[in-house]
């Protein structure tokens, strides 16, 4: 049985989602897991499960089970690491894009924009950061503004005209990689978007 298959079966059997498998030099086998996402319904609000994360105990449980499975299958590795996806989680399929719709993501295209850029962005550009949205055509798009972020304490002129939003539509086949943007706010816990506060 192939490594991917062994790990997927073991992780799914324990009730987790396999995000990524990485083999590194020196025999390191790194497995990234996450909780299985269930799309919100009328009965289950989107807020339920939003604060659930992979714990150390989850990683320990998967590690123990994988050690047995990999030994039985004769997979050669020196060290096994099981971890949560972190703040820059890889987005690999349609379900991941649905789950993180509205979040800021970083994408890398397989090919540069070329003539399709139409002078809006540099023709050789392949990397973009923006809010993930569902496109009208049924695909996906990211929306961003090239306006620099406002610094804390900076005064904003009332006459200032905000930079226009730009959008880039794409299909999953056009992506080399997509990840959640690692944006960290060190100011403490604020209110979530959409909450009064």
UniProtKB/Swiss-Prot annotation:
Gene that encodes the chain: rimP
Record flagged with keyword Glycosyltransferase: no
Record function comment: Required for maturation of 30S ribosomal subunits.
Any one Gene Ontology cellular component term annotated for this protein: cytosol
Family label: Belongs to the RimP family.
CDD domains from the UniProt entry: YlxS_C (cd01734)
Organismal lineage: Bacteria, Pseudomonadati, Pseudomonadota, Betaproteobacteria, Burkholderiales
Subcellular location: Cytoplasm
Chief subcellular location: cytoplasm
Keyword terms, alphabetized: Cytoplasm, Ribosome biogenesis
Name of the molecule in the record: Ribosome maturation factor RimP
SUPFAM superfamilies per the UniProt record, alphabetical: YhbC-like, C-terminal domain (SSF74942), YhbC-like, N-terminal domain (SSF75420)
Keyword Secreted: no
Domain of life: Bacteria
InterPro entries assigned to the protein according to its UniProt record, in alphabetical order: Ribosome_maturation_RimP, RimP_C, RimP_C_sf, RimP_N, RimP_N_sf
GO biological process, one term: translation
């Amino acid at each position: 049985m192939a490594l991917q298959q062994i790990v997927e079966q073991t992780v799914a059997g324990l009730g987790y989602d396999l995000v990524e498998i990485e083999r590194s030099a020196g025999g390191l086998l790194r497995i990234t897991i996450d909780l299985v996402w269930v799309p919100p319904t009328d009965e289950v609000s989107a807020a339920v499960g939003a604060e659930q994360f992979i714990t150390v105990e989850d990683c320990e449980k998967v590690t123990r089970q994988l050690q047995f499975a990999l030994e039985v299958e004769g997979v050669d590795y020196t060290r096994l690491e099981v971890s949560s996806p972190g703040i820059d989680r890889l987005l690999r399929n349609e379900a991941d894009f649905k789950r993180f719709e509205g979040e800021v993501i970083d994408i890398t295209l397989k090919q540069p924009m070329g003539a399709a850029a139409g002078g809006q962005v540099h023709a050789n550009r392949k990397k973009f950061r923006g809010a993930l949205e569902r496109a009208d055509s049924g695909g996906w798009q990211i929306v961003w503004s090239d306006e620099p972020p406002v610094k804390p304490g900076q005064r904003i002129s009332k006459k200032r005209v905000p930079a226009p939003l730009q959008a880039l539509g794409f299909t999953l086949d056009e992506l080399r990689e997509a990840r959640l943007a690692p944006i960290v706010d060190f100011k403490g816990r604020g209110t979530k978007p959409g909450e009064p506060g």
